[in-house]
């Protein structure tokens, strides 16, 4: 992604907030993604975490895929180290997003710290889809802040619900993590390469399940995906130089 197509900030037309496409997209992403927090909260409690541990994950880790991977490994009987490893590997992409958004939006002083916390799939997507610098800023901040607030709110609702209903399997919530994770993943499988990565990682996970302890297959698949991404980035740079 390149910011070269953005209209310079001092010449672009200013769109009112109420008419801004970036604001609408950001709010829509905030609501849609935030609702998944209910599933995370309930399943985190079922995995053995307390209410405050669950809230800390949403407030500090704050990346849905990593959070679901973390509790998925724990609920499957995996060790804490495997859960942390899986979550960390899935969160590597946010580092790339952060570098991209820093160059694109140029946040300064204390705003850079907040921007780092709300740099996720949704804020990156909302910013990248806009044609002007101002709209990209609006898309990033509206999506990032709205997802953060609603994700944490609905995590609390889900955690309280998890305490109330007991065994999530009685209510079908044991499958909610898979459904929620797929919901987060599905929009990113529209292109050929992400779909190929998902298929390869799925096959690797399935092959590893009978051979290694619980939680390790997710780590192995994450390493495969990370290696694929690094090799792809290197190949892209070589083509650009040639």
Where do the model's predicted regions map?
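Short juxtamembrane and helix-loop transition motifs at transmembrane-helix boundaries
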Residues: 12-22, 44-51, 75-79, 104-108, ...
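C-terminal ends of transmembrane helices
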Residues: 96-104, 125-131, 183-190, 228-240
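Intrinsically disordered, low-complexity non-transmembrane regions of multi-pass membrane transporters
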Residues: 1-22, 134, 233-242
């Amino acid at each position: 992604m390149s910011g070269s197509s953005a209209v310079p900030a001092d010449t672009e037309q200013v769109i009112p907030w109420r008419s801004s496409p970036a604001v609408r997209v950001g709010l829509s992403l905030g609501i849609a993604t935030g609702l998944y927090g209910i599933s995370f909260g309930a399943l985190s409690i079922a995995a053995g975490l307390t209410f405050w541990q669950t809230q800390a994950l949403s407030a500090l880790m704050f990346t849905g895929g990593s959070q679901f991977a973390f509790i998925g490994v724990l609920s499957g009987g995996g060790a804490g180290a495997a859960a942390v490893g899986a979550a960390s590997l899935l969160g590597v992409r946010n580092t790339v997003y952060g570098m991209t958004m820093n160059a694109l939006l140029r946040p300064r002083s204390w705003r850079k710290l907040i921007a780092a916390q709300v740099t996720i799939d949704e804020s990156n997507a909302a910013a990248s889809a806009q044609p002007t610098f101002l709209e990209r800023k609006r898309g990033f901040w509206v999506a990032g802040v709205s997802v953060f607030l609603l994700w944490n709110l609905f995590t609390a609702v889900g955690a309280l619900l998890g305490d109330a209903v007991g065994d999530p399997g009685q209510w079908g919530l044991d499958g909610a993590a898979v459904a929620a994770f797929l919901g987060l993943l599905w929009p990113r499988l529209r292109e050929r390469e992400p779909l190929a990565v998902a298929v390869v990682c799925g096959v690797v996970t399935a092959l590893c399940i009978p051979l290694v302890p619980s939680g390790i297959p997710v780590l192995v698949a994450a390493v495969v995906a990370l290696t694929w991404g690094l090799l792809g980035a290197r190949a892209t740079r070589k083509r650009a130089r040639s």
